[in-house]
């Protein structure tokens, strides 16, 4: 038997998506633009980082070759390694959305071939009858926001009014989401989570992918900050995923971070919560000591997207990548014969791009472990090849989509 470890560097795209123009993302390249900005000094921040982007361990896994495959150019200021010891390539997304569930479900062998529902860009985002039903079911005096917004901006703008009135802040984005921000102490965390459950139920006919609880603390617009108690309420995947097939085969899926929420806890045998990339890596390393033959350890490293991509923070994103790179030797030391690790992403979120939304990009594939031969696997037609590769490695039946690259 064998073990598999799947790490999603949330939003770490490598550009080059052939359908990017259809999404308004022609030229978006998360890795390439971060490297370009860092090489030009625009990725420097006092006390955080400076200079060209330094990712020696990821580079040794083929990251720069991946960038060349995906976008046609090497990242600025980064030197090719003397040798590559990982299997490497990039993948196109065939799901119609560039959102978190679509990316993760496709990675797990289930592309999203239908259109999500979205809320209008102009005017009130949410239908009046939906708002009325929410307020009635949840006994609310009303809601604030009702618009497309950046989460941090709307918190600064409406957080104090929320604390005065008790009305939750409800907003959306270009993704298929309904987000609800509320103060953990003034409104109450449990009350916020119950509200999200109500909204999730009411949104069934709207085909909205996720309801997201965004709890925060603080006492004024100057110091409001989100807490680690975010919760995602996703619709279930449209058909069984790799996780379901593993569970049916008697294997354990260790779902770390927001993986359980993304899959609506369908096929996720063991949910482990952690807040922030460092804590997520710590939890992952601990589980690597415990995982049995045949298990999958599946971790989402959310900070790249949540803290830096959406906030268009190049120095922050670069520093987070460099920190992750430094953790990789700890992963190597945990590996035993039969292990395979795959690093990938679910979409892009170019921190140099206009707006605050995800970007349509190819994603990297880096696979390594004892017995994994270093080579290029080229550009894959779908993220689902990742899930099929894990299925083949763990010895379970193939799914309907994708092809193993082992």
From Swiss-Prot:
A biological process term (GO) from this entry: 5-phosphoribose 1-diphosphate biosynthetic process
Taxonomic placement: Bacteria, Pseudomonadati, Pseudomonadota, Alphaproteobacteria, Hyphomicrobiales
Organism for this UniProt entry: Allorhizobium ampelinum (strain ATCC BAA-846 / DSM 112012 / S4)
EC top class, as a word: isomerase
Pfam families: Metalloenzyme (PF01676)
Reaction equations catalysed: 2-deoxy-alpha-D-ribose 1-phosphate = 2-deoxy-D-ribose 5-phosphate; alpha-D-ribose 1-phosphate = D-ribose 5-phosphate
Chief subcellular location: cytoplasm
Positions with a binding annotation for Mn(2+) 2: 305, 310, 358
Protein's job: Isomerase that catalyzes the conversion of deoxy-ribose 1-phosphate (dRib-1-P) and ribose 1-phosphate (Rib-1-P) to deoxy-ribose 5-phosphate (dRib-5-P) and ribose 5-phosphate (Rib-5-P), respectively.
Superkingdom in the source lineage: Bacteria
GO MF annotation, one: phosphopentomutase activity
Protein name: Phosphopentomutase
One of the record's GO cellular component terms: cytosol
């Amino acid at each position: 038997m064998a073990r598999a470890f799947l790490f999603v560097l949330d939003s770490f795209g490598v550009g080059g998506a052939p359908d990017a123009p259809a999404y308004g993302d022609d030229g978006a390249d998360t890795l390439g633009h971060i490297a370009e900005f860092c090489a030009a000094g625009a990725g420097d921040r006092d006390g955080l980082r400076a200079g060209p982007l330094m990712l020696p361990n990821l580079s040794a896994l083929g990251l720069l070759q991946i960038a060349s495959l995906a976008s046609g150019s090497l990242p600025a200021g980064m030197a090719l390694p003397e040798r590559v010891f990982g299997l490497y390539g990039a993948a196109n997304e065939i799901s119609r959305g560039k959102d978190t569930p679509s990316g993760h479900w496709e990675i797990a062998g289930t592309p999203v071939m239908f259109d999500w529902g979205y809320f209008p860009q102009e005017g009130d985002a949410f239908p009046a009858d939906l708002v009325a039903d929410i307020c009635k079911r949840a006994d609310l005096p009303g809601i604030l926001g009702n618009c497309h917004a950046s989460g941090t901006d709307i918190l600064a703008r409406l957080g104090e009014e929320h604390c005065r009135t008790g009305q939750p802040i409800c907003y959306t984005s270009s993704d298929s989401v309904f987000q609800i921000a509320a103060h953990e102490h003034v409104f109450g965390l449990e009350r916020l989570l119950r509200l999200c459950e109500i909204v999730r139920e009411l949104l069934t006919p709207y085909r909205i992918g996720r309801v997201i609880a965004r709890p925060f603390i603080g006492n004024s617009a100057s110091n409001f900050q989100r807490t680690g108690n975010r919760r995602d309420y996703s619709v279930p995947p449209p058909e069984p995923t790799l996780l379901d097939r593993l569970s049916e085969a008697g294997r354990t899926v260790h779902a770390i971070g927001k993986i359980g929420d993304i899959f609506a806890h369908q096929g996720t045998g063991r949910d482990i919560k952690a807040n922030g990339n460092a804590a997520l890596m710590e939890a992952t390393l601990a589980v690597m000591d415990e995982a049995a033959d045949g298990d999958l350890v599946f971790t989402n490293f959310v900070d790249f997207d949540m803290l830096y991509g959406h906030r268009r923070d190049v120095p922050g994103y670069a520093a987070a990548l460099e920190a992750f790179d430094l953790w990789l030797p700890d992963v190597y030391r945990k590996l035993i014969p039969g292990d395979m690790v795959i690093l990938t992403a679910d979409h892009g979120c170019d921190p140099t791009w206009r707006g605050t939304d995800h970007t349509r990009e190819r994603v990297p594939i880096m696979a390594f472990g004892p017995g994994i031969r270093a080579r290029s696997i080229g550009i894959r037609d779908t993220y689902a090849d990742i899930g099929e590769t894990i299925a083949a490695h763990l010895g379970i039946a193939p799914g309907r989509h994708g092809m193993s690259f082992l």
